[in-house]
């Protein structure tokens, strides 16, 4: 019998649970553990096969208002160094980038929705790069 996959989901807003991510994991019968980063203790990342970091209203460049992001970035940096795949969505992507000293800067105006993504050579080789999604038509609908 094969061991069930375990995914850790890090959420930032209590009213913003796993949503579609949780539904997809449920569909594939993948166990997930959902924790709120600002409230819950971060578990040992080696207990999981992957980590998904959700969005939120925080910003990586606003650490005095969101001090938990410092701890979260260190946690994500260590998880990746231990070989655990991580996927960041919205704020989660900012946190992952910032954890590895990539430039994350404030947009001139608030943006909610989709932006075009460009991959580096290394990004193209990453199994979590979602290349197919990013090369799909410019618009699509989600249920």
Task: Give names to the regions the model predicted.
Residues 35-37, 107, 142:
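Conserved beta-strand termini and adjacent loop/short-helix elements that scaffold enzyme active sites
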Residues 110-143:
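An acidic, glycine-rich "communication" segment
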């Amino acid at each position: 019998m094969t061991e069930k996959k375990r995914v850790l989901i890090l959420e930032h807003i209590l009213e913003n649970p796993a949503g579609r991510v949780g539904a997809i994991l449920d569909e594939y019968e993948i166990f997930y553990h959902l924790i709120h980063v600002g409230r819950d203790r971060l578990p040992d990342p080696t207990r999981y096969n992957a980590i998904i970091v959700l969005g939120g209203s925080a910003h990586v460049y606003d650490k005095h208002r969101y001090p938990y992001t410092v701890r979260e970035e260190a946690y994500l940096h260590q998880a990746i160094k231990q070989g655990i795949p991580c996927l960041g969505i919205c704020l989660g992507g900012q946190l992952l980038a910032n954890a590895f000293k990539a430039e994350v800067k404030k947009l001139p105006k608030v943006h909610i929705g989709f932006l075009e993504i460009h991959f580096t050579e290394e990004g193209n080789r990453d199994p979590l790069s979602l290349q197919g999604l990013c090369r799909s038509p410019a618009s699509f609908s989600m249920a």
